[in-house]
Amino acid sequence: MQLDRRLRQLFFKTTAVLFIGCFSLGASSQTPHCNKTVYLSFDTGNMSVAEKVAEILKRQDVKATFFLSNEKTFRGDFALDDSWKSYWQERVKEGHHFGSHTYDHVYFVKDGPKGEVFEKPQFGPKAGMTLLYNEAAMCKEIRRVDQRFIELTGQPIEKIWRAPGGKTSPTLIRMGNMCGYEHMGWAGAGFLGDELDSDKHPNDKLLAKASKSIADGDITMAHLGIWSRKEPWAPAVLEQLIVNLKTRGFCFGLLPKSRSNQSK
């Protein structure tokens, strides 16, 4: 009986050690040491993979910054319609950050003659027209996203914005600054290629390139859906990219960098 008791005690001690060891391994695999920071960002696009992106970010416990524009979505509505209210509310609850991508997704064309800029809205009542914007008009265009986001979620966006296509000039950047919004572009290595042709730029090559080339402090850029790409990027690439970057020692920050709270 004494031997049986000793065997039982040894069994329980061994089991406890194994359990604790397994738990520790599991925890450490989810919280790798990080000594670098990358900033994931997403522009609205057609929103076709918006739910998938949110699902992956939540599962990986990673935060991102979303740049919003009232773009037409795959459902036939628009990204800042009430029909997307719950989506944006959930992202707020999860702790993501948000910036303006201009309300009507206005593309910079060229500088104007007297300190203005020529812009071409992609959406809205003046879509496709090349228009002259002074500082007040450009400020209104950037700020409309902020105002609409407050209506949808009760929370303002960060004081940041991103010009569609990343097309800017010193005059345009100054206009945003005067309005109180800092422009946020992306790194060369941070261009994740989800808007490129699928045949020429397949997902496996995009994943390999980004996993290798992204560097400390880089801002990445992808979309919540692209009309032209046949092979959707996010479902095939995003999660593995996050895992690969974690393995390389990256944490994930929020924009603007001055207000970044790193996630694992």
Regions found by a protein language model. Name each.
Residues 2-15:
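Bacterial N-terminal signal peptides that target proteins for export
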Residues 30-117, 123-133, 141-159:
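Active-site beta->alpha N-cap acidic-glycine motif
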Residues 31-32, 60-64, 74, 230-264:
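C-terminal domain-boundary segment and adjacent tail
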Residues 44-49, 70-83, 106-111, 160-170, ...:
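Acidic-and-aromatic substrate-binding clefts and catalytic sites of carbohydrate-active enzymes
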Residues 51, 55, 86-89, 136, ...:
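Solvent-exposed, polar/charged alpha-helical surfaces in well-ordered, non-transmembrane soluble domains
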Residues 97-105, 165-168, 221-224:
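Histidine-centered catalytic micro-motifs
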Residues 167-213, 249-261:
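His/Asp/Glu-enriched short active-site or ligand-binding loop at hydrolase and phosphoryl-transfer sites
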